[in-house]
């Protein structure tokens, strides 16, 4: 496809729904559910050990509870299954399913969860891997992360398009972007 965008779609499910599922199932505040999701969740229950336990903060003065990591995965897996099933339906609707020889590339923070790639491979029946920005000159390690893949990819795509129409040089745009992101992280972390 020569790097051209052939299809885009929106799937109305993401990490916030997973956090909400965890908060409701474990009866814990959302901020604790988010931390539990990031630190312990697994998208494929068979990969999470039943012997591994985590502490789940309770509401109010109640003491934290122990929960097996596998039980947490049993809360998370159905939402990831739904997400990947919707993505597969979108790929089929696009008419490009047979034109994906190298498989599927997952991006975004939700893709980083343990077991996400393996579950996606089960659903898509094709190779799946995590995608992170790699080919932009000057990218710091902070930005070389699946969380930023979409934003950086769109910037690079736009910069290349600008170059072909006589706009600013793509490497100049990428360099300026990296500087601004690095400065932002320096101020906030």
Tell where the protein language model's regions lie, with residue ranges.
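Helical "lid/coupling" subdomains associated with nucleotide-phosphate turnover
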Residues: 1-189
């Amino acid at each position: 496809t020569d790097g051209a965008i052939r299809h885009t779609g929106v799937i109305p499910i993401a990490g916030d729904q997973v956090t909400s599922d965890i908060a409701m199932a474990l009866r814990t505040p959302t901020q604790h559910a988010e931390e539990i999701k990031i630190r312990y969740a697994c998208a494929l229950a068979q990969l999470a050990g039943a012997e591994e336990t985590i502490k789940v903060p309770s509401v109010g003065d109640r003491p934290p509870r122990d929960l097996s990591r596998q039980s947490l995965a049993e809360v998370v897996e159905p939402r990831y299954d739904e997400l990947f099933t919707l993505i597969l339906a979108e790929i089929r609707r696009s008419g490009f399913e047979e034109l994906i020889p190298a498989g599927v590339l997952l991006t975004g923070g939700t893709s980083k969860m343990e077991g996400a790639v393996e579950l996606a491979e089960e659903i898509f029946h094709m190779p799946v891997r995590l995608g992170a920005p790699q080919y932009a000159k000057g990218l710091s390690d902070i930005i070389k992360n699946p969380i930023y893949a979409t934003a950086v990819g769109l910037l690079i795509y736009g910069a290349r398009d600008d170059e072909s129409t006589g706009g600013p040089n793509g490497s100049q745009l990428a360099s300026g972007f990296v500087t601004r992101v690095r400065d932002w992280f320096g101020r906030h972390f």
